[in-house]
Every structure is written in structure tokens, then in C-alpha cells.
């Protein structure tokens, strides 16, 4: 009975750099070969048998963890960029609406300042937040009393 060498799947290309000859080695690369021939095949020679290099499980887990964290970081950055662009789109559409309402209030003719009449007073508090300006208009009516 003649032996046919087993061709097994080698470690993934990215993790192949981390393949080592640590024990336990499970995958046999070839039987009845010299130490030099085993090294030429890129395998490990241990106790007369040529084993395939293995990537330790802790390296595989660590690599997967790095990929997951990097993916979460990229997704977070993309989400923040999208949210910021949405906020920038909302600001220009809101600004003309508040400007129109302030113009309408200012163009109304003031009432005569007679006894018991109500005169509107206009307050314009403004606040700046993260580089954009939100303007709001508060109209209050105060009663004037004659003494």
C-alpha cells in the first residue's frame, strides 16, 4: 500500500505569518521525508514526522477581535458623519422660516398708546451652539396703566 500525501488547507493568507511550530501539531505535511525536505515544504520536523505549521487559536481569536473593534469604529465614524450632514441640512431650512415670522411681527402697525391699550414688545434672545445660530422670537404683551 503506497502512501499518498495529504493536502490540507493551509492557514489563511493573512494569518500565515503567525504560523508556528509549537506543540501540539496535528496536521501532517508529509511522511518519510528528511528534515531538509520538510523545511523546503514550509513545515515543521518533529520526532521524525513532518507537520504543517499551525496558527495558534489565541492568535485567531485576537485577530478576530481586532477586526470586530475596527469594524465598530468605522461604523461609528460613518454614523456620526451622516448625523452631522443631516443636522447641517436641517439648519438652512429652519432659518428662513424664523426670519419670515420676525418680519411679519415687525411690519404690524403699533396700536395707539391710549388708556388701557396693549402694546406688543419684542424680545429676541439668540444663542450660538456648535457653530450655528438659532434665532427665536418671543412676543409678549404688557398692559400699560395710567396713573
UniProtKB/Swiss-Prot annotation:
Membrane-spanning intervals of the chain: 58-78
Membrane side Extracellular: residue ranges: 1-57
User: Low complexity bias located where?
Assistant: 109-120
- Keywords in UniProt for this one? Membrane, Transmembrane, Transmembrane helix
Question: Polar residues bias located where?
Answer: 99-108
Compositionally skewed regions (Basic and acidic residues) per UniProt: 125-135
Q: Where in the cell is it found?
A: Membrane
Q: What is this protein called?
A: Testis-expressed protein 29
Looking at the record, which segments are called Disordered? 86-147
Predominant location category:
membrane
Q: Which GO terms describe its cellular component?
A: membrane
Q: Kindly indicate whether the keyword Transmembrane helix belongs to this entry.
A: yes
Q: How does it sit in the membrane?
A: Single-pass membrane protein
